[in-house]
Amino acid sequence: MSGVFHLNLTKAQLKGATLAIVPGDPARSERIAKQLDNPEFLTSTREFTSWLGYINGQPIVVCSTGIGGPSTSICVEELAQLGVRTFLRIGTTGAIQPHINVGDVLITTAAVRLDGASHHFVPLEYPAVANFECTTALYNAAKAKGIEPYVGVTVSSDTFYPGQERYDTYSGKVYRNYQGLLKQWQDLNVMNYEMESSTLFTMCSALGLRAGMVAGVIVNRTQQEIPNEATIKQTEEKAVSVVITAAQALLS
């Protein structure tokens, strides 16, 4: 019988794991887990696909969050109930600064809370910030891999299209409150858009948990909107190598 409402997992299945790697894509969970020692499939229900693996004999759970803050909040809450205390998000992203290239790696220190889920945990004035130890581990891991990461602020939006001011849509329209925001975030030196970090950071900070995030750039919004499969694969591999190395450091 499951020990939590949605993930269909029990504490015994996690074997004492206190660190989770949380991608958005369920298929990415398997690809990450298979780079760990003794990977074991646990369960898949809705957007949540879970694996267990080991680094230097220590268990790590890999569990997909799905897209956006609401499902991320469920994943984090239920993994915390099962004993996880550190969350490393790995994702793909669209950069908005012209000097950031496709294939680059971004480490998020804080997020603009352009979402709704984080407001269910903390008031608007509360910042969405990553844990310092997690951020440092991700940065050092990237450098150790010969990767020069960009480090900074992310916009975290509930929606992929209007919230990120995309006009390549069925209607071609963006609600006026979001018109011009892309240029505003560029002027404020924000690196990129994604959809989970604001919920992850605010929730973990409020609950006394640790969270960090690394993302691979698969498009630059100043250049193109649609990525190609080869780029996604190569960029994902770089970001995954960083998150696994960071996990090892945080467990040591």
Curated annotation (Swiss-Prot):
GO cellular component, one term: cytosol
GO molecular function terms noted in the UniProt entry: uridine phosphorylase activity
Matches recorded under Pfam families: PNP_UDP_1
Presence of the UniProt keyword Cytoplasm in the record: yes
CDD domains (UniProt xref): UP_EcUdp-like (cd17767)
InterPro entries assigned: Nucleoside_phosphorylase_CS, Nucleoside_phosphorylase_d, Nucleoside_phosphorylase_sf, Uridine_phosphorylase
Annotated metabolic or biological route of this protein: Pyrimidine metabolism; UMP biosynthesis via salvage pathway; uracil from uridine (phosphorylase route): step 1/1
Record-level GO BP terms: nucleoside catabolic process; nucleotide catabolic process; UMP salvage
Catalytic activity field: uridine + phosphate = alpha-D-ribose 1-phosphate + uracil
Subunit structure: Homohexamer.
Family in the record: Belongs to the PNP/UDP phosphorylase family.
Job of this protein: Catalyzes the reversible phosphorylytic cleavage of uridine to uracil and ribose-1-phosphate.
Protein's name according to its UniProt entry: Uridine phosphorylase
